């Protein structure tokens, strides 16, 4: 009787272990493309995404490429090797400018990255203008 309970317990533990390993492998496989925070322009150019695949592209806003027409923005993002055209409609962050880092979320349509969101990258010493003004008044 005791050996029967022990063998059932061992089988249950083995089955649970196999199920846990399988679930972890399936989750890892499903997330393989989403683990990377953003792709560089070179990666997007050499390995084009599927039609309407939402992804992030990151790099520096190329000097001389930023064109603004009301709320419409078009610019090129570069990683120093390849540049990729981006278009965006909306309000851009205060720190968004040529020569600065940016990450855009969207999809590639007709060879142009159509962004739905723009993030500006900044260093660790960034201080919002409101706080900088308060700091200046305090001094």
Curated annotation (Swiss-Prot):
Function text = Heme chaperone required for the biogenesis of c-type cytochromes. Transiently binds heme delivered by CcmC and transfers the heme to apo-cytochromes in a process facilitated by CcmF and CcmH.
> Which family does the record assign?
Belongs to the CcmE/CycJ family.
Q: Does the keyword Transferase apply?
A: no
Q: Name one GO biological process term.
A: cytochrome complex assembly
**What is the native source organism of this protein?**
Ruegeria pomeroyi (strain ATCC 700808 / DSM 15171 / DSS-3)
HAMAP family, per database record = CcmE
Please list every transmembrane segment annotated in the UniProt record, as residue ranges. Answer: 10-30
Any idea what this protein is called? Cytochrome c-type biogenesis protein CcmE 2
Q: What is its main location?
A: membrane
> What subcellular compartments does it reside in?
Cell inner membrane
User: What is the membrane topology noted in the UniProt record heading this document?
Assistant: Single-pass type II membrane protein
Question: Which GO cellular component does the record give, naming just one?
Answer: plasma membrane
Q: Which residues bind heme?
A: 122, 126
């Amino acid at each position: 009787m005791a050996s029967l309970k022990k063998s059932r317990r061992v089988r249950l533990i083995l089955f649970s272990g196999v199920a846990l390993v399988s679930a972890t492998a399936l989750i890892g496989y499903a997330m393989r493309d989403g683990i990377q925070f953003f792709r560089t322009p070179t990666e997007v150019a050499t390995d084009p995404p599927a039609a309407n695949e939402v992804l992030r592209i990151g790099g520096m806003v190329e000097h001389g490429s930023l064109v603004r027409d009301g709320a419409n923005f078009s610019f090129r993002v570069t990683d120093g090797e390849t540049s990729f055209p981006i278009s965006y409609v909306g309000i851009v962050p205060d720190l968004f400018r040529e020569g600065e880092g940016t990450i855009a979320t969207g999809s590639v349509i007709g060879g142009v990255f159509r962004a739905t969101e723009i993030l500006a990258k900044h260093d660790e010493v960034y201080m919002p203008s409101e706080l900088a003004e308060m700091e200046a008044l305090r001094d």
